[in-house]
Amino acid sequence: MYKRQIIHCDEFQTEGTDKIAERIKKRVGDNALYLSIDIDVLDPAFAPGTGTPEIAGMTTREIVNVLRGLSGLNLVSADVVEVSPAYDHAEVTSLAAATIVYELTNLFAKS
């Protein structure tokens, strides 16, 4: 059916968020898009409150910039997963997740 395309976090550094957003838009085209964001895509410095923190992840600025660059896609559904309040002592992860949900809501409004 659909082939997945993996974009590694280091590509955000080498290509920049604008080019990554364009790659995603080209790949998706006019198809309906379900976007699932696992919070552990963010570096633990930006999202420590997850069950599986991964070093060398994205920054919050990178994910916000990419989401803003996806305007015009046929976004039909989205979610943010793996936020674990038990590990989120300063609520940094919850704030990052809320910001992502805000940006996703803006995308829905523009779809």
Label the predicted regions.
Residues M1-Y2:
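Short, small-residue-biased leader/transition segments that mark boundaries at the very start
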Residues Q5-S111:
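Catalytic cores of soluble, metal-dependent hydrolases
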